[in-house]
């Protein structure tokens, strides 16, 4: 899903060269992770099953503003939150699984933390390129708003268990 989101952003905002470069790197890395997960699953006799989307990302996306460049900034800030939450989940799971999978989760944690930083840096770059009145303040306000929404999503009961879901019902 992360690779798909990044590719959509690349096509939609093709005029931001720095965005193109960073997102192309992210897509390659996410697709490598996808292949690695498929290999893990195959080695363990796990069958691939498509899952419906949980409410986490959709709940965050409700906060995206409807005008540009603010909509892009919001998507990037939300991307950072998704990556940060992935870090938290991989960190929590790594000591609970077998050694091989734990090592892989720690590897993913490092990658996701880099993606978190990349998304925030891109959001700030877009805000500066668009010559917003106070780019740093705009980004900070969006982080604070999305943090509150994200907190509610994580702490509230969730009927559908997913990697980024809230408290299981």
Where are these regions (language model features)?
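Non-heme di-metal
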Residues: 1-169
